[in-house]
UniProtKB/Swiss-Prot annotation:
Basic and acidic residues composition-biased segments: 352-373
Record's signal peptide: none
Encoding gene, per UniProt annotation: rpl4-a
Key word Transmembrane helix present: no
Predominant subcellular localization, coarse grouping: cytoplasm
Organism: Xenopus laevis
Biological processes per GO annotation: translation
Keywords per UniProt: Cytoplasm, Ribonucleoprotein, Ribosomal protein
Location in or out of the cell: Cytoplasm
Region (Disordered): 352-374
Designated name of the protein: Large ribosomal subunit protein uL4A
Length: 396
């Protein structure tokens, strides 16, 4: 596959209907070197897609087509309006409220919602330029899921003779000769039933996207290609972002006719001249011509303007508690060692003095008793008194 340096080549080969190079070359249009901005593409795609919506709303009578009145207070039930009558399950049930079965929804939808979105023309063109630039990068095309392993070149340009095709079998043969039929087989393999309610709304089957054929003049080409699954047909003068970047993701596989490919410079211009077919439009330019930041920052011009790096390492000092660390305390207070030594000696002297102190015969102070001990002693004293009283009674 000759696509590794495709987007960097100044010339693109034109291929014949037999899938071989015709010998002609086309200059790579400048739009394929435009900045690729997925954020702008996604934003524009989201807003343009909203313009296809059909207004919808619930009926303004929904949930109110019954006779109901609140029972008021005093019945130990909620004050929600209740259906009148009897003899049926419906009578007495809550009505009207959004919390009731059969009631209206909260904030019923209206048809005068703001459905459409306006997008700046320049921003739309920027998104189209980004989508076209991404279609020239094989890595982005393959990441989108397109099967382009065997095609001869990216972007793929064919002769203008293709625009006069009128039969589908001619279009199928061309795709097979260009080795692009694998992408169509991928579409066939992806055909499946839609999940969800869309099956009931005439949207039963879904499938993947195939190649996008971009032409200059329709001399029967649309009828030849339109019945092939996954194929999208676009006129180069009416490029649509919703088709170039399905889902808001860049990297659509595009097949160009020669005249359409040559017309891109007139449509979008180059960085040296503005577009001929668009009024006052210039191709968006890259913010950086060289994206190698390492090379830029280490260049001599920038290094000369920078000051020398400050390599002094300032380490945080570990703070220690001087009340627990004697060495730190001595650094703060050199007398601390002497004071501590005096305190220890004084303590030793006090201990020795207590040991040498003679007993002067004075009664030692008794240790105060706790409540439990007091109660035990009091009980013993009462028992002793009772025994003495009993002995005295016996002697009498």
């Amino acid at each position: 596959m000759a696509v590794s340096m495709a987007c960097a080549r100044p010339l693109i080969s034109v291929y014949s209907e037999k899938g071989e190079s015709s010998g002609k070359n086309v200059t790579m249009p400048a739009v394929f070197r435009a900045p690729i901005r997925p954020d702008i593409v996604n934003f524009v795609h989201t807003n343009l897609r909203k313009n296809n919506r059909q207004p919808y709303a619930v009926s303004k009578l929904a949930g109110h087509q019954t006779s109901a009145e609140s029972w008021g207070t005093g019945r130990a039930v909620a004050r929600i309006p209740r259906v009148r009558g009897g003899g049926t399950h419906r009578s007495g049930q809550g009505a009207f409220g959004n919390m009731c079965r059969g009631g209206r929804m909260f904030a019923p939808t209206k048809t005068w919602r703001r459905w459409h979105r306006r997008v700046n023309t320049t921003q739309k063109r920027y998104a189209v330029c980004s989508a076209l630039a991404a279609s020239a990068l094989p890595a982005l095309i393959m990441s989108k899921g397109h099967r382009i392993e065997e095609i001869p070149e990216v972007p793929l340009v064919v002769e203008d003779k293709v625009e006069s095709y009128k039969k589908t079998k001619e279009a199928v043969l061309l795709l097979k000769k260009l080795k692009a039929w694998n992408d169509i087989k991928k579409v066939y393999a992806s055909q499946r039933m839609r999940a969800g309610k869309g099956k009931m709304r005439n949207r039963r089957r879904i499938q993947r996207r195939g190649p996008c054929v971009i032409y200059n003049e329709n001399n029967g080409l649309v009828k030849a290609f339109r019945n092939i699954p996954g194929i999208t047909l676009l006129n180069v003068s009416k490029l649509n972002l919703l088709r170039l970047a399905p889902g808001g993701h860049v990297g659509r596989f595009c097949i160009w006719t020669e005249s359409a490919f040559r017309k891109l410079d007139d449509l979008y211009g180059t960085w040296r001249k503005s577009a001929k077919l668009k009024a006052d439009y210039n191709l968006p330019m890259h913010k950086m011509t060289n994206t190698d930041l390492t090379r830029i920052l280490k260049s001599q011009e920038i290094q000369r303007a920078l000051r020398a790096p400050n390599k002094k390492v300032k380490r945080r000092e570990l703070k220690k508690n001087p009340l627990k660390n004697l060495r730190i305390m001595m650094r703060l207070n050199p007398y601390a060692k002497t004071a501590r030594r005096h305190a220890i000696l004084q303590q030793l002297e006090n201990i020795k003095a207590k040991e040498k102190k003679p007993d002067d015969g004075k009664p030692k102070a008794k240790k105060p008793l706790d409540a439990k001990t007091k109660m035990i002693k009091l009980a013993k004293a009462k028992k002793r008194q009772a025994r003495e009283a009993a002995k005295a009674a016996e002697t009498k």
